[in-house]
């Protein structure tokens, strides 16, 4: 149970001696160990910080989380509705047995493109969200801005060490 305190002390020693790369690794171990002792909302927050950026020590976690967000929203958009040049994509689960796999793949790629463009807040306007997708695309934009900032900050922190 006190292992996390040892990691914290080791991280502090490396940091005070300006050995920042190793200090960062021990900080990561400290936070991972500390998470095991937490409960409730504190544990939830700690796990979220681990998933999103590896406690500020793993920029690839932010990149992977971003890709997962884009993929999840792309799938959701297939069911909540997007309009491409007047053609509405708004699937129902029962349609999967009727539709050709090629059509589903093309629609998924269009949805993935829309999700990526929305996440990066480019928003070309060639695909328009409809219905619930309007709210979801706003949420994805906010997540996109946040995740790009987290990834940039985490990467800059690692590079400057």
PLM regions: where:
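Disordered, glycine- and acidic residue-rich low-complexity segments typified by the G-patch motif
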Residues: 1-39
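Residue-level hotspots within the lipid-embedded alpha helices of multi-pass solute transporters
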Residues: 13, 66, 142-145
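Short amphipathic alpha-helical coupling elements at transmembrane boundaries
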Residues: 25-28, 50, 114, 137
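Coil-to-alpha-helix initiation sites in intrinsically disordered, low-complexity, charged segments
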Residues: 35-47, 94, 103-110, 130
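Transmembrane alpha-helical segments and their cytosolic interface motifs
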Residues: 40-80
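Outer-pore turret/helix-boundary of cation channels
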Residues: 67-111
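Pore domain of cation channels
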Residues: 99-161
């Amino acid at each position: 149970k006190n292992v996390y305190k040892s990691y914290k002390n080791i991280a502090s020693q490396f940091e005070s001696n300006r050995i920042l790369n190793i200090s960062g690794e021990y900080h990561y171990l400290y936070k991972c160990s500390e998470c095991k002792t937490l409960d409730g909302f504190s544990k939830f927050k700690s796990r979220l910080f681990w998933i999103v950026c590896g406690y500020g020590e793993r920029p690839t976690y932010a990149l992977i989380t971003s890709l997962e967000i884009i993929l999840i929203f792309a799938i959701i958009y297939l069911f909540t509705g997007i309009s491409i040049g007047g053609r509405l994509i708004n699937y129902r689960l029962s349609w999967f047995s009727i539709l050709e796999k090629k059509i589903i793949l093309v629609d998924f790629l269009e949805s993935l493109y829309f999700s990526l463009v929305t996440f990066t807040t480019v928003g070309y306007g060639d695909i328009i969200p409809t219905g619930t997708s309007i709210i979801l695309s706003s949420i994805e934009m906010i997540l996109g801005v946040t995740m790009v900032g987290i990834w940039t900050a985490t990467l800059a922190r690692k590079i400057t060490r």
